[in-house]
Amino acid sequence: MTQAATIEERTMVTEAVDTGFRGIELLEQPLLNKDTAFTEEERDRLELRGLLPARVTTLEEQVALEMEHLRRKDDDLERFIGLAALQDRNETLYYRVLVDHLEELMPIVYTPVVGQACQDFSHILRRPRGLWITPDDEDRIPDLLRNAWLDDVRLIVATDNERILGLGDLGAGGMGIPVGKLALYTAGAGIHPARTLPVSLDVGTDTERLLADPLYLGWPHPRLRGEAYDRFIEAFVEAVNEVFPHAVLQWEDLKQHNAIRILDRYRRRITSFNDDMQGTAAVVMGGILTALRRLDAPLSEQRLVFLGAGAAGIGIARLVRSAMRAEGADELTMRRAIAMLDSHGLVFDDRDPLDDDKREMALGAKELSHHGFDACEPQARYDLETVIRRVRPSILIGTSGTPGAFTEPAIRAMAEAVPTPVVLPLSNPTSKTEALPSDIMAWSGGRALVATGSPFDPVDHEGRPHLIGQANNAFVFPGIGLGTIVSEAREVPDAFFLAAAETLALCTEESRLAQGALYPSQSDLRRVSRAIAIRVVREARDLGIGRHLDDDEIESAVDAEIWEPVYPEMV
């Protein structure tokens, strides 16, 4: 057994463990280091005497001190850097801080602050994390995976860095997303950090600012495309199957065309999913189902308009159709229920241009006629307000990345059509949101139910506070990952995401829904993730693709896999 595997085994338990390290070498192991919390006895046994200040502190005191440090910093990027430094020094303390202050710190370790960190990556990096794979490594990817110091990786988040949040191609800077996402897998679902691996598939960048930067840390070439890109992805998938055959692979921030076809190509060859498509779909579906509790109406009776026909929008629309089908809706009802717009306006069959990726969501002649769009010419363009007035949607979803795209006339048209508009401007970061919640509430006369992709404060409308829930994928992907790991599922089917959405909707308390919130508090993330994981393991069992466990065994198996960041005694 390698020394790395030994570290992993020892950090998975909380009873007394033999570290295998002494002195400075022990303090340099982030998964074992306790800093000033080493006891007097441990300091003597482990040759730490004199290497630490005299006072022995508790984990709780360390958490309080770290929060004091963070709150003293001048801005959120400095807080991000401070948390990253803590993660590099003492992972148990890092995750204890996150778990205890998740609602305050989630915007720092992930959206929106991680976006700024990714943009500045080459100039703020202190210590590299994860694995970096470039086209120069295509013939030796298994060797690179073995260079990772972990022998039992169960969860990989991999990005090619081309569509980082709503910020585009950030090259090597995109690594901040897998690192941040895996931090939330651990903080949110208790997946042990020693079983996770962030991966940057650094295939270059087409962002001139980065290529011209003499301090840029990535592979300094134009982005790999076409057959060469496909060969590289194939080599990576084969290598993961070879080296980490039990790992779940989550694709992250691939551009639309690659995201859809890579998901469809590999989802049954390797246990994998795309969070931007499927995780986003599940968290949005969860918010929709929560809203339907307030509306007291079935999904199959709703009409939805999407502004944005990229991977996220198509993923949401696919899951909406699956949920409608589960309710018993027929094909015609499902096709009429969804209208999608992109940068060229309404998406319909004969439109020119129309990308192949969008054809599955394009309206046909019958659906167009049903909504009053007669004799559409290939060059016809219909904007959002026109589509809203024709379709009369009850739900409006934005994944366009276009700030201000939900205009006042569009929202007012929706409010005229339905008594309680459900408006979801989901684009990240905050600067990309389709509309501000305060504007939506004003334009809808305070009747809208609003959830956003980035965090927003409550909105006061005519003396009544409205909570703005955040449709954060972190409500879904930790539980999906944990459930897939525990179930040992051979694939991650759509049924997992619909199950996660249904579970998430049940986790939003009535008191929050009464104030307009479509999602639970982020401080409830561990409770939500556990519930989703249990449901996913049951779904895997019922579908015959996972372990055969009864319901009590499932709960025990999930609980056994959840790691709590506490210090074990060391001998």
Language-model regions, residue ranges each:
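N-terminal ligand-binding/catalytic initiation module
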Residues: 2-272, 539, 546, 565-571
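Adenosine-phosphate binding glycine-rich loop
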Residues: 7, 32-33, 275-279, 295, ...
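Generic secondary-structure signature for well-ordered alpha-helical cores
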Residues: 44, 48-51, 72, 123-126, ...
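Short acidic, glycine/serine/threonine-rich loops at helix termini
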Residues: 144-145, 166-177, 208-215, 259-265, ...
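N-terminal Rossmann-like NAD(P) cofactor-binding subdomain of oxidoreductases
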Residues: 256, 349, 376-378, 390, ...
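Glycine-rich phosphate/diphosphate-binding loop of Rossmann-like nucleotide-binding domains
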Residues: 269-270, 274-395, 547
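Rossmann-fold NAD(P) dinucleotide-binding segment
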Residues: 383-396, 401-422
